[in-house]
Every structure is written in C-alpha cells, then in structure tokens.
C-alpha cells in the first residue's frame, strides 16, 4: 500500500510521514491526492483539520466540480487550487526522479489569502512542471474525463481492437494484425508526432500512406465526433462522475477491476503483443 511505499522511499513515521488526520493538521499546503473515491471517504477527516489560511491542493477537479456527488465543499477561509500534470502519477514520479518535468494545467478555485495563484504556481514548479497553462477546475475535469474515455484510453483501445479484428477476420495472422495496428504506431509513428507534430509524421511516411491517411482522416472525424460529443455531454452532466463513484466505492471494486483488466490482458491482440515486445531489439 501507499504507506509501505512511502517507508521504502525513505519517509520516516512520525517525522515526515503521518496518518491523514495528523498530516492535514500539520500542513499549510495540503495536497489532496487520494483517488476520487478515496477523497470522498477521507473528506470529513481532512475538512475537520484544515486551518484558516491553509491551501487545499488538488491534482484533479473531480471532487470540487462534482460536489453534489462527492460532498467536498471546502470552508471559505482556505485557498483552493489545482495543479494537474498531463500524465499519470507514475509518469510524474519517474520524470521527477530523472530531473525532468511534465506539462501541467493550474487553476485557482478559491483565493482566501490573496496569494493562492502564487502558491499554486510555486507548488507546480516544486513538482517539476515547468510549462503551465491556466484553466478552471471545471474545464480541467471536463477535458480530462473526456480525454480518458476517448482518444487517450477508451477510444484508443476500441480503435485498436476494431482494426485488429477486421484484419484477423480477413485472414491476417495475429502477428501481422498486431504489427499493423499497434507495434508500428508505438515504435515508429507516434514518436514522430510527439517529436514535431502530425504533419511531420505524415511527411516521413510513404506517399501512398500519406494519401490514404489524408483521405480517410475526415471520415473518421465525422464518424467519431458525435460519439465524443455524446461522451462530453455525459461528462459535464455529472453522469460519468456518478458512474465512476458508484463503481469505485464498491467493496469488491478492486476485484472487479482486476477481472476487467485481466480480460483485456487476455485478448488475443494483447497476447500477440507480449510476444512481439519480447522480440524488440532492446529485449533480445
């Protein structure tokens, strides 16, 4: 658990590692970084130990924006701010350990002291976020939840699986279907997008690939945009938040999640991927 990980990382109990109640009482900038469901559960304890002038710091706007579902409503005599790194917690940590940062958005929800913005930006620098862009709690959570459900995760898995299944149904081997769907994307094409943009990736592919991609991209946009709009509306209405809270608050949540992830792991597409990853030059 997180307590054991903290001990392994060198934190010392009763010196700089405390239970939530004690940490909230001692702190002046309280970084509230539990899971969304965990924040709901711990909020009465944290709220009771906030002091006038404290700063309540979030990395995600979920608890504040969907307060009708979370009951997280901070007192008026504290600053409420957000720094949302554009990556997973694991990425933030590994980049920090390597002396690198990760882009982040920041927002001030409540400025009791008159210094909330300065405190927010200073804390962002402290975690290694050198490039910041300002947003609001609402915009952060609405874009974040939409991105996770669509292009960043949900749509990505769905699109990968759809193409893989089409290729397999037309007689292509698992290896070929995986390579043409995922391996080439991750190893060759996506790094080019990251390096200099989509046009750079197009420019470094064959003319046949360029023509096909340019012709088909608008068709996918027109097909997918209504689905993404539907997702966005469900996010801003709070429907997706309610689903997440109800699911993640169940006593068997972890067991059910493990089952769902195991089902993904055992899909033929990803089984083929395990074999192919082992054949990458760096793994031989």
Region locations from a protein language model:
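Small-residue helix-packing motif on alpha-helices
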Residues: 3, 23, 174-178
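NAD(P)-dependent Rossmann-like dehydrogenase/reductase catalytic/cofactor-binding core
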Residues: 169-284
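Amphipathic alpha-helical segments within well-ordered protein domains
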Residues: 161-168
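Anionic-ligand anchoring segments at beta-strand to alpha-helix junctions in alpha/beta enzyme folds, i.e.
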Residues: 1-7
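Rossmann-fold dinucleotide-binding core
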Residues: 57-149
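Rossmann-like NAD(P)-binding element
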Residues: 7-65, 73-88
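A ubiquitous short alpha-helical element
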Residues: 144-151, 211-217
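C-terminal catalytic lobe of FAD-dependent flavoproteins
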Residues: 151-161
